Every structure is written in structure tokens, then in C-alpha cells.
């Protein structure tokens, strides 16, 4: 469980906007949240591990792929990664797919409060080393804790910087 819903709630300073669960795969639909009557934050089902049958996971994959490929006003996708884990091939493959399809994205490491500073730096470094094997330039990286609201200001600043661009394309 990477903590997507918890991060959404922390970003918009609303405890129960997105339903949270300790169970991976809780988000099974595309949920649109209109924020301040100005912009949408969209919560997609997780692309990776979920405690659901393989057929449902395949449906998630197709639904997410179609959404991302056909969403012309998508300004930036947030790829959330639980910083406690070593680089996962599914995350790497997904980010390569995004790059191939020219879908703009940033990496957001979640649950930073669960690690000490040394282990946190080591785990992020492992991702960077792995990605530099095939990437010329790494995507922008954010390090967050929804519980402590670490990194949320930086993400909100990114969203605000994208909003003028969003208004131009709608």
C-alpha cells in the first residue's frame, strides 16, 4: 500500500476526501476530485500490487492505460513509490511506458517518515542508480510523508505552477 489516498488528503488538507485503507487495491475506480472549483486531482487504481484477482488487475491495467493515453488535458502524472522498498521492476516498466508515450510525470516517494535519514537517502539513491542505467535525465523527484505532511508544499507548488498551463488547454 503506497498511500495514494493518504497523500491526496494531505495535499488538499482534508482528512477524508479520498477513502483510505491499509489494504492494497482499495481504489478500484477512477475518482475525480474537484479542488477549490479550479482543478482536478484524479485518483487512479494502483498500477502494481493489489489484493485482487489477476483478471481484475488486468482490467485496472487496461483502464489506467486507456485513461492516460486519451486524457489530452493531463498535465502531470504522479508516480507514487513506497520509499521503504527497493526498486521494483513494475515501477521501472511503468515509467518507461510513460516516457515512450510522452506522458509527463514526476516520482513521489511516500512514507519517508518510516525510515531514518540514512536509509531514506540509500533507498532513493538505489532508485536513481537503477534509473540512470537507462535514463539520460531523471524525472523530478519528491519525497513525502502524508502523516507528517513532509514534501506536500513542494507538490502543491508544482500543481499551482501547472494550473495556468491547464487553463490554456481547456
Protein language model regions, located:
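Short, flexible loop segments at the rims of nucleotide/cofactor-binding pockets, characterized by
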Residues: 17-19, 53-57, 82-86
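Conserved nucleotide-sensing/catalytic segment adjacent to the nucleotide-binding pocket
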Residues: 35-75
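Short, glycine/charged-enriched secondary-structure capping and boundary segments
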Residues: 11, 54-57, 92-96, 121-124, ...
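Conserved C-terminal guanine-recognition region of P-loop GTPase G domains, centered on the G4
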Residues: 62-139
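Amphipathic alpha-helical transducer elements in NTP-driven molecular machines
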Residues: 27, 57-61, 92, 149-152
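Conserved G1/Walker A P-loop phosphate-binding module
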Residues: 1-51, 161-170
Amino acid at each position: 500500500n503506497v498511500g495514494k489516498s493518504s497523500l491526496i488528503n494531505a495535499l488538499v488538507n482534508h482528512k477524508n476526501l479520498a477513502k483510505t485503507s491499509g489494504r492494497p487495491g482499495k481504489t478500484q475506480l477512477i475518482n475525480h476530485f474537484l479542488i477549490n472549483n479550479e482543478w482536478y486531482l484524479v485518483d487512479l487504481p494502483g498500477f502494481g500490487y493489489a489484493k485482487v484477482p489477476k483478471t481484475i488487475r488486468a482490467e485496472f491495467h487496461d483502464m489506467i492505460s486507456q485513461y492516460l493515453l486519451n486524457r489530452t488535458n493531463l498535465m502531470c502524472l504522479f508516480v507514487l513509490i513506497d520509499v521503504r522498498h527497493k526498486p521494483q521492476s513494475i515501477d521501472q516498466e511503468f515509467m518507461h511506458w510513460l516516457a515512450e508515450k510522452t506522458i509527463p510525470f514526476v516520482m513521489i516517494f511516500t512514507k519517508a517518515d518510516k525510515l531514518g535519514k540514512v536509509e531514506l537517502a540509500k533507498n532513493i539513491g538505489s532508485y536513481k542508480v537503477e534509473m540512470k542505467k537507462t535514463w539520460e535525465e531523471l524525472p523530478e523527484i519528491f519525497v513525502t510523508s502524508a502523516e507528517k505532511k513532509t514534501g506536500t508544499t513542494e507538490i502543491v507548488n508544482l500543481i499551482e505552477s501547472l494550473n495556468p498551463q491547464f487553463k490554456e488547454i481547456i
